[in-house]
Amino acid sequence: MPNIVLSRIDERLIHGQVGVQWVGFAGANLVLVANDEVAKDQVQQNLMEMVLAEGIAVRFWPLQKVIDNIHRAADRQKILLVCKTPKDFLTLVNGDVPVTRINVGNMHYAEGKQQITKTVSVDDQDIVAFNGLKSAGVECFIQGVPTEQAQDLYKLL
């Protein structure tokens, strides 16, 4: 079973909060970005890699590759798994990726979205995905940085 130390939804994927604060807090030594678009975008990958400290490995995999390969992870790999959307995590969970808790970070406001906290806005598609995660027994909590108090996302929907 893969050693996933933290699963996080963050539209920015890897940035300062994730690359420094969450990696350190979780004790991760591998950041696995599960995103179909970024897996094909070397420029985005290079920018994200610059944020990570020396010694932290990173992989940029499409969702299906994560589903197909996550169970081959070595025990020594302490994985911080990050996706852009709850729909992506629902795809992973439905593909038997062992995710039981998701830290919800940045989901920015846009037309058609409802702001539920200062950093999290959701639309109907997000709510459907979160309800699917809830049905699968996945806990979802909002916490921007490790020093903030976590909030139960489901109570805010």
Region locations from a protein language model:
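Generic hydrophobic/aromatic pocket-lining and core-packing "Φ" positions
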Residues: G19-V20, F89, F130
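Short, ordered loop/turn segments at secondary-structure junctions
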Residues: N35-V38, L63-V66, P86, G105-Y109, ...
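Glycine-rich, aromatic-bearing surface loops/beta-hairpins
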Residues: G95, T100-L157
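Short basic, glycine-rich beta-strand/loop surfaces that mediate nucleic-acid
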Residues: L47-V51, G55-R59, N69-V82, Q115-S121
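A general structural motif
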Residues: D10-I14, P62, V122
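Structural motif
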Residues: N3-S7, N29-L32, A57-R59, K78-L81, ...
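Ordered, amphipathic secondary-structure segments that act as subunit-interaction surfaces
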Residues: W61-G105
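Long, hydrophobic N-terminal alpha-helical segment
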Residues: P2-A57
